[in-house]
Amino acid sequence: MKLLAAEDFIDNTSDAELSPSVIKIMSGALDAIAARGIRRLSMSDIIDASGVSRGTLYRYFSSKEEVLAAVSEYVCTGFENGIREAGHGIADPIERFKAVMIFYARYTNENSPDRVFEVEPRFHLEFFRSHFDRFNRAVKHALRPVFDHLDQLVGEAINRDAFAETLVRTQLSTLLVPASDEWQRLWNDTAENVEKWAHKFALVQPREAGKD
């Protein structure tokens, strides 16, 4: 089943995206997908899982497809807003980097329940494929001061697009193989390790240049 694009429904729900009822519907829909899968999912399942009345559900969404599109947008927007807020107001670039990395790992764990991926892998795959560029942009934007700092350390511009995409692809891999405690520790230590690498690179460059 192909999900509707967000613009196919957003005009009908933009005024209520943050209302308690819509949030309950989104959360309930995710639970229902995990329990039933998309093909078997019905509007009644969403009503039961979210605890809203039939009238409330149909006030915002006229079909299951609209709910699924809204769920995709809800999860993606939540990531974009959350990763931006994670680093907001943190002046130290490495501390900002740490905060962003910790948020990203937590968000993946809390918003991509294993049961959904097991029951409905197609939903996950289509979601991440259609929102992949937005995830990359959100990470790159959140780490902009970090990239500025690293550019200064190494004396040249790093590839920001590749850096951000590597982080996104790495975090997505944990949906297939859950992260161990050791891997999680390495992920959380990425900021400090990258800074150490940048310092070492900066020290080596002048010596290498002197050999030429």
Question: Regions from the language model: what does each represent?
Answer:
Residues 70, 84-112, 164:
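Hydrophobic alpha-helical connector segments
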Residues 50-61:
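Short hydrophobic/aromatic patch on the recognition helix
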